[in-house]
Amino acid sequence: MKEEKRGSRFLLIISVFIIFYIILSSSFYFGFINAYIVAGALFLTLMISWIFLFRYRHTKGKFGKVSLIVLLVGILFIFDFFLLQFEQMKYRTLIHEEPVQAAGNSGIHLMSVGTAYFSHAESKEWLIKNFERGGQDFFQIEEVDNKTRYHSRNDVFLQLVGIRNDEVSVMAKNVRSYLGEETAGVEQFLESEDISGDSAGLGLALTGLIEQNKLMNNLDFGVTGALSEQGEVSGIGMIKEKLMIAEKERYPFMIIPSENAQEARQVKEAESLEIQLFAVSHIDEAVRLINRLNAEAEV
């Protein structure tokens, strides 16, 4: 009877803590509290748990149950401790990044949008003035809320424990698998530390084909799109910003994923862009397109 009562009490304590944690996490997610309060509350709970663990260190049954509670609280404390690194982020800015060619004058320009976080900016208007004063092009400035911090923490944690591979690693694996062999320009690009996301996959694979002398190109193309190992092209984010960059660079052509075609056409019409858009769902379509446009240019 006593064992059943102790077991019920243990389950009650666990249930109360889980409810407490759900309320704590929800309060953070919806912006009622900050990461310091979350970490502080869990740290205090962990210290109290350690006190009970020390108290019952010679009581076999209770020691085991309290140890489980300490372990649970400790894991959640470590998990939520990652929130602190995002707490200082106040604003996120999407900025214009110069397109790059991974290999010489391949004509394949890899499109990317820079992301910068600011922790000490006085206000959104202050940031805008400083960007304009410095002549830096930017697309938008948005305030970082707790929902963004929460999801960013989850992504970082999953990558650290190996549950989710980061997009750059997946892109590198897919490009290398598709090409079948390493090429100097592609490898140099993949080894750089300032790349993020997987939207350069299609452009890198096309660059690799040029380096392998399997594709000839004398035109300028803005290229964006994720790539699978089999050469399928999938959608990417920030298509509007990438189109605006390509237009500013005066590229005549832009190759985009078919999944982004509708949005891209809407952006082109709304912004009165002159660039010609070509949507592809497989890299083979991009290769045929490049061959055709080069042949037409020679006539």
Predicted regions located by residue number:
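Peripheral, non-AAA+ core regions of ATP-driven protein-machinery
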Residues: 2-299
